[in-house]
């Protein structure tokens, strides 16, 4: 598997994660947001023809070279310091530059195989690399539900003040 910037050649219409809003956003908005500089989307795709054949042999006959196995989107944002956990808020000025992890989705039939962990690690790495050139104190995410919040917490994200679905991971 490799993670690439989303392009028009990736099969957005064949992606199904089980959450219609995430499917529709990928199909209808992701490339438009990239063109406007709003966000950047990164897609996990099969590494090569050999890996594509391995997926097919493992019971995934519809996975082809340009199939999207999972994706995430990143954007620059600001949050107010008083939204952060109290122990972190005191370290920052009133407005804190962050990288927003706007979406993270995995193909429905690939859930539970570690792909989400790999995409999250890629998102953190890209965010840290970008923060070396453009300031960002951490990664901010709005979890869609309690299960998603628990998922992010197991990778070091902490709840923001007054909202258990808003989570933050300091970069430094």
Indicate where each model-derived feature is located:
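Non-catalytic substrate-recognition and accessory regions of acyl/acetyltransferase enzymes
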Residues: 1-113, 117-172
